[in-house]
Amino acid sequence: MILSSRLRLALIKLLAAMVVMVCAPAQAMADSPVEQRFAAIVIDAQTGETLYARHADARRYPASLTKVMTLYLAFDALDAGRVKSADPVVISRRAAARPPSRLGLRAGERLSMREAMDVLVVKSANDVATALAEHLAGNEAAFARAMTAKAKSLGLEHTRFLNASGLPQAGHFSTARDLALLGRAFLRDHPDDYTIFDQEQTVFRGRLIQGHNRLLSRPGIDGFKTGFVNASGYNLLTSGVRDGRRVIAVVLGGRSARSRDAFMAKLVQASFSSLAIRSAGFELTVADLMAQPAAPLSYASVASDEVASRPVIQAALTQAEPTTAQGDASPPSRLWVQVGAFRSKARGQARLADVVKRHPRRFGSGRGT
């Protein structure tokens, strides 16, 4: 695309006004606990290209991001006909004894496969993760071996699973890059089922369960999972789509859920901006558009590890999302709502009917039922 010099200059000024680099503190913090746990990556979901990376190949505790693989294998089993969504999953004594977060069912109680999977996403219930693993593989250790084998087959070379929940266990690890690749594999292999991650809440036997993923209320962001254990810090795997371009992002080791979410929102926004720059025919890094650095975030360093000739995300927007004008009580425009992409029309219609119930804040329907 050929642009006049005036138009190019105007576009550069516009982008410079929108984008601000998140700079690292002047003092190196390589030995700090924060830096030892922090890792992040953004990839283009279509091409697999790395847009941003920081400590992306360093071993980290995945915490409840582990449950994305648990659900991947559950959907594999459903697709193969080995189990059905209505099949009962029994809570064993071992499952009932798992530490929080948990649903709290007693040993011997049951829930359906579909209920278990929904609760696994929204509640991040460790007791349900163990019960689901036992239902699918006989015991959790066997299921964990299947998880690791699947990881290797998907190209996750630096991942080892020892349980289905992500509770801390020596030798249970992954990397930011591997978790992003897992997200990409889920989108590719289970596209109709990805919408399970786009739930702000669920109802289990009349009990409303609120989720932990606050980014789901943001336009364009449509799924995946939060995670936390003391050893890992606050983790998040997310994905979003804008103008037909989807990115997958992972942030590990946040100091708090709030700082993790703020960093992720800015990182995703910056990724979309970088892709827009490319589509306009520019070979500019976000740093080229910067005038003044922003105040540091709660991470020791966010400079990119990747060196390439094409633009690499090295920044985040000052404001992750535009705010609604004060006094405007109307809900956001429905134009931005993406229900999903489905191979089956019937599944798409079923999902559409379920959206309002799962996202009451988006549709102004209160607590929902």
Regions found by a protein language model. Give the residues of each.
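Short structural boundary motif marking the start of a folded domain
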Residues: 38, 333-336
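Bacterial N-terminal signal peptides
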Residues: 12-24
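Active-site-adjacent loops and short helices of periplasmic peptidoglycan-processing enzymes
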Residues: 28-177, 187
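N-terminal secretory signal peptides that target proteins for export/translocation
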Residues: 1-9
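Extracytoplasmic
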Residues: 177-333, 343-369
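Short aromatic/hydrophobic contact patches that present stacked aromatics
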Residues: 59, 248, 336-338
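Local beta-strand/beta-hairpin segments that build beta-sheet-rich folds
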Residues: 51, 289, 339-340
